[in-house]
Amino acid sequence: MRVGVLGAKGKVGATMVAGVQAAEDLTFTTGIDAGDPLSALVDTDTEVVIDFTHPDVVMDNLKFLIENGIHAVVGTTGFTDERLDQVRKWLEAKPDVSVLIAPNFAIGAVLSMHFAQQAAKHFESVEVIELHHPHKADAPSGTAARTARLIAEARKGMPPNPDATSTGLEGARGADVDGVPVHSIRLAGLVAHQEVLFGTLGETLTIRHDSIDRTSFVPGVLLAVRKIRENPGLTIGIESLLDLA
């Protein structure tokens, strides 16, 4: 399979280039960065593109890829419901093209989201803390937002988190994502980390995941690349590729 990388000079993108080049069953075609023409992907007969760019350009990238029949594995953040709907509309005209967008490709992070969803209905309270390097463009992270939504879905019909806070500084209790408080930390020295804290009478449960190096994303991305043709249309997350019940 012939694979190109968008954002190839970024920290994650460069890691993806190295990962593709090291895979015996994949052929690296080209790396594209800001200012480079996307047409190079067509010229090199690229079949699948890995996109780790920026929310400001990812939609233009996807429009080009879909129109040219190139599958996409996307780790870029900033996808709203409206953006996802637009991607689905573009894909209607290209039913054989596959796009997979994931908030996190680290296997441990995906498992932690799954475990949090399973635990959610068994605890009275839950909050999410995500911690990242200070160069991250979005807050909360896509992983934290998705985690919160999965938890909220699992807690449907349950009372909201007990919280007697009546006064305080704006934002002190975090962002509200479908009723789940999410707190964002940006700190030099961090890569990508998340804690989900559950509490109920007499006990707490903490589910934590740490990506200490960007190579943690490579196995999940390459899994998505290898499976991309099997799921035409838009797929969110890599959970379905991991056979999580």
UniProtKB/Swiss-Prot annotation:
Coiled coil: none annotated. Disulfide bonds: none annotated. (S)-2,3,4,5-tetrahydrodipicolinate binds at H133, G142, T143. NAD(+) binds at G7, A8, K9, G10, K11, V12, G75, T76, T77, A102, P103, N104, F105. GO terms for molecular function: 4-hydroxy-tetrahydrodipicolinate reductase; NAD binding; NADP binding; oxidoreductase activity, acting on CH or CH2 groups, NAD or NADP as acceptor. Keywords: Amino-acid biosynthesis, Cytoplasm, Diaminopimelate biosynthesis, Lysine biosynthesis, NAD, NADP, Oxidoreductase. Its EC number is 1.17.1.8. One of its GO terms (biological process) is lysine biosynthetic process via diaminopimelate. It is found in: Cytoplasm. It catalyses: (S)-2,3,4,5-tetrahydrodipicolinate + NAD(+) + H2O = (2S,4S)-4-hydroxy-2,3,4,5-tetrahydrodipicolinate + NADH + H(+); (S)-2,3,4,5-tetrahydrodipicolinate + NADP(+) + H2O = (2S,4S)-4-hydroxy-2,3,4,5-tetrahydrodipicolinate + NADPH + H(+). Pathway: Amino-acid biosynthesis; L-lysine biosynthesis via DAP pathway; (S)-tetrahydrodipicolinate from L-aspartate: step 4/4. InterPro entries: DapB_C, DapB_N, DapB_N_CS, DHDPR_bac, NAD(P)-bd_dom_sf. Its main location: cytoplasm. GO terms for cellular component: cytosol. The active site is at H132 (proton donor/acceptor), K136 (proton donor). Belongs to the DapB family. Catalyzes the conversion of 4-hydroxy-tetrahydrodipicolinate (HTPA) to tetrahydrodipicolinate. This is 4-hydroxy-tetrahydrodipicolinate reductase. The lineage of its organism: Bacteria, Bacillati, Actinomycetota, Actinomycetes, Mycobacteriales. The gene is dapB.
